[in-house]
Amino acid sequence: MSMPATSTKTTKLATSLIDEYALLGWRAMLTEVNLSPKPGLVDRINCGAHKDMALEDFHRSALAIQGWLPRFIEFGACSAEMAPEAVLHGLRPIGMACEGDMFRATAGVNTHKGSIFSLGLLCAAIGRLLQLNQPVTPTTVCSTAASFCRGLTDRELRTNNSRLTAGQRLYQQLGLTGARGEAEAGYPLVINHALPHYLTLLDQGLDPELALLDTLLLLMATNGDTNVASRGGEGGLRWLQREAQTLLQKGGIRTPTDLDYLRQFDRECIERNLSPGGSADLLILTCFLAQI
């Protein structure tokens, strides 16, 4: 797990501080997957709309990824004097190596590929901010991550070629920018919506699990989730957004009784083979940023 050659200087950050942030990332991944019931997603109750993965796969995956999060932080610190647009290139080898360990831990199952991208970006942003003695807050972390991704959507989604990736196809057909667009914009769905919503519910004394489930509904209602669109097309995405919005308008998830609505929503997502994995990734970021 050596550092890429594009690092420019040695980090001065304490190992204990780096490991603390990595632990927060691991906790965020575990919190999300253990949260139940989640419509269409793997949780403690069932495997959602997934036939190829189980809860234990996510637990093994999160542990494997935790070991790499310090590398993202260290690279963010070592590259602090580089132009932010140049950082992403150096992060890619770390992300690919982390992805390899994830696949080895899960016997080939893609459990957290989206989170490797998003958590990797945020961890690198934290490393850069710490190295530059700048405040580490949800806003500064996300804006720094955005600076790493400047031009990413243009470079990777608007390219015309005969062999379109799934992301390019969804962008051309539906205008969805997915994880790339959200990162380049500085995670506005998290910073402007999910995180303040979650923290407000906690301040009101709501049970943390209920608060997270309600926040997941908010993300599902507002996120142009490419995971959903790739499975169910535009119709599937719009249906899921409407259902989530309807539950929010009815009062959301405030009591254990409200979980019955989520269980029904889960059954319907499974029947339609829809899994809001993109919203789950954003919920992980919400959990992570709420801790820093």
From Swiss-Prot:
InterPro entries: CitG (IPR002736), TriPribosyl-deP-CoA_syn_CitG (IPR017551). Pfam families: CitG (PF01874). One of its GO terms (biological process) is prosthetic group biosynthetic process. It catalyses: 3'-dephospho-CoA + ATP = 2'-(5''-triphospho-alpha-D-ribosyl)-3'-dephospho-CoA + adenine. Keywords: ATP-binding, Nucleotide-binding, Transferase. Its EC number is 2.4.2.52. GO terms for molecular function: ATP binding; triphosphoribosyl-dephospho-CoA synthase activity. Belongs to the CitG/MdcB family. HAMAP family: CitG. This is Probable 2-(5''-triphosphoribosyl)-3'-dephosphocoenzyme-A synthase. It comes from Shigella flexneri. The gene is citG.
